[in-house]
Amino acid sequence: MKNAELYETHVKTVNLESAVAFYKSLGLELAYLLEERRVAFFYLGDSEKKQQMLGVWEVKEHEFVPSHFAFKVTVEQLRSVPQLLEAKGIALSPSFGLHASEPVVHAWMPAACYYFSDPDGNSLEYLALLDQEPKPELGVLHLSEWEKTFQ
C-alpha cells in the first residue's frame, strides 16, 4: 500500500548479548528477548506509543550478512551525535568519500547524516530531514557546504 509506514526492521548479529548491550547503549528500550529463538526486539522512538521496532537476530557467523538502516532524528539531535557516540566509544564512519567531522548531506532528499557501525559491522545512520528544497545536482556534501548554498 502506498501510505503504509515501516513498523519494524531487522538486523543480524553473531553475538546477541553484545548486540543487546550496544543497542541499549544507544538508548533503545528492550521490548522483548526470546532466548530460545536468539532474538531481541527494541522499541524505536517513543516506546509508550509502540509504533516502531527493531529486531536483532543471532545467526551463525557464516550466515551473517551486514545490513543498513537509519534512525530519524531532528537537526538539533543530529548535531549532538558525535559527542553521544564518542562518550560510548563508538566511532563515526567516513561516508561517500567525506570525513566524519560533520554531517554529510544527501542533497536530493535533502537530509543530513552521520554514519557508524554496530559491533557486527551493520551500517547505522542518524538522519535528519532538512527544510530546504532538494538540490540533487549537489550530490553529497558536508552540512557546512550545504548551508553556504542558502546564504
Regions inferred by a protein language model and the residue ranges of each:
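Short polar/acidic secondary-structure junctions
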Residues: 46-47, 59-61
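Conserved beta-strand in the GNAT
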Residues: 52-57, 125-128
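Short, flexible helix/strand-to-coil boundary loops that buttress conserved ligand/catalytic motifs
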Residues: 23, 82-85, 128
